[in-house]
Curated annotation (Swiss-Prot):
One of its GO terms (cellular component) is primosome complex. This is Replication restart protein PriB. Keywords: DNA replication, DNA-binding, Primosome. It comes from Yersinia enterocolitica serotype O:8 / biotype 1B (strain NCTC 13174 / 8081). Residues 4-103 form the SSB domain. One of its GO terms (molecular function) is single-stranded DNA binding. The keyword DNA-binding applies.
Length: 106
């Protein structure tokens, strides 16, 4: 059985983080990360773009999330999973296990 599930994505926070506490008392922070880059595919440059919902869970990670605002540039590493929305549609979500702020050089 294959069990590898890792994703690293960098980008800019494009939606205001929402903080909630689950019925079991686990704090969660949700936001959306927008990624834009140029990648090489089959010897050609290709513009890539995506918006990825991010979930940060657990008490230890919450202190870091209070510094995250719209416009923050981050590198996020974690695992992906499907979540079913209220509309019944599945969406891919990145569960962050490590977050690093990208220095803008200012």
């Amino acid at each position: 059985m294959v069990t590898t599930n890792r994703l690293v994505l960098s980008g800019t926070v494009c939606k205001t983080p929402v903080r909630k506490v689950s019925p079991s008392g686990i704090p969660h922070c949700q936001f959306v990360l927008e990624h834009r880059s140029t990648q090489q595919e089959a010897g050609f440059s290709r513009q890539t773009w995506c918006r990825m919902p991010i979930i940060v869970s657990g008490q230890q990670s919450q202190a870091l999330t209070h510094s995250i605002t719209v416009g923050s540039q981050l590198t996020v590493e974690g695992f992906i999973s499907c979540h079913q929305g209220r509309n019944g549609l599945n969406k891919l979500v990145l569960h962050a296990e490590q977050i690093e702020f990208i220095d803008s050089g200012d």
